[in-house]
């Protein structure tokens, strides 16, 4: 470092002597020139620094799926250069994002989901609260004969049909071959709303493929809707034109 400083100072003194100018004038000119160069190449400089940070911190790799709504990016990273990051969106459009934006702003990288081997499904169905009631003894006797009642924990002398339904759904998820059994899963109630009692299913698919993920999600909720009547429950939905028509006819 000392040798480098001596060389720099010596060079400045030699140049100032050759052009017959004060070293102070030369330093001032160099400072102004440096400022102009930084202004002209600021994107390149910031991109280079950001690129180093992205690589050093393993924040981004080609092939990663990222989402960055501010820049309209939602797809796979195609290329990372000093000045741009190219992202191919799912609609096949290509978005370019400056690397420093990925460092300064927040973005979502889905690599962890693929590495983990499970894709989260978090959806709820609204139950009509008018259909929530205690089960009769005959109903409980019928339920107890089913294999999904294994491990059932009674809450008291009378059981609520919604509680039985949640227990059934947990059994269904635990024995579904396309559900990741190594990750958390639960069926829970959310805060009641004017649209009914939300019952949320929270689990992870065993396959991270988008199409298989969507198919599993639809398959599970088709089953949920089809089994509601078994527990004498109904899903809530806003009245439609046909509902008003039937009411008028009555």
Question: Which functions belong to the PLM regions below?
Answer:
Residues 1-56, 90, 94-120:
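Membrane-contacting alpha-helices and adjoining membrane-interface segments
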Residues 145-250:
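Long, non-transmembrane cytosolic or organellar matrix-exposed soluble domains/tails
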Residues 5-8, 17, 48, 83, ...:
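Conserved, well-folded catalytic cores of nucleic-acid-processing
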Residues 11, 74, 124, 184-186, ...:
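Conserved beta-strand residues within beta-sheet cores
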Residues 35-36, 84-86, 134-135, 194-196, ...:
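Flexible loop/turn segments at secondary-structure boundaries
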Residues 56-159, 163:
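Soluble accessory domains appended to multi-pass membrane transport proteins
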């Amino acid at each position: 470092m000392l040798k480098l400083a001596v060389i720099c100072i010596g060079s400045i003194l030699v140049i100032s002597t050759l052009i017959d100018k004060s070293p102070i004038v030369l330093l001032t000119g160099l400072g102004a020139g440096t400022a102009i160069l930084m202004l002209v190449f600021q994107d390149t400089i910031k991109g280079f620094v950001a690129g180093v940070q992205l690589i050093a911190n393993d924040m981004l790799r080609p092939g990663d799926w990222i989402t960055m709504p501010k820049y309209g990016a939602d797809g796979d990273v195609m290329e990372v250069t000093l000045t741009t990051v190219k992202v191919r969106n799912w609609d096949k459009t290509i978005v370019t994002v400056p690397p420093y934006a990925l460092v300064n702003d927040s973005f979502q990288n889905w690599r962890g989901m693929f590495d983990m081997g499970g894709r989260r499904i978090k959806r709820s169905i609204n139950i009509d609260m008018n259909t929530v009631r205690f089960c009769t003894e005959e109903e409980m006797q019928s339920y107890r004969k089913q294999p999904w009642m294994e491990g059932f924990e009674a809450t008291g002398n009378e059981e609520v049909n919604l509680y039985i339904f949640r227990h059934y759904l947990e059994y269904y998820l635990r024995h579904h071959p396309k559900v990741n059994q190594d990750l958390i899963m639960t069926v829970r109630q959310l805060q009641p709303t004017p649209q009914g009692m939300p019952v949320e299913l929270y689990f992870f698919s065993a396959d991270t493929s988008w199409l298989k993920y969507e198919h599993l999600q639809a398959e599970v909720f088709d089953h949920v809707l089809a089994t509601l009547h078994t527990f004498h429950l109904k899903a809530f939905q806003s009245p439609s034109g046909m509902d008003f028509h039937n009411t008028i006819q009555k």
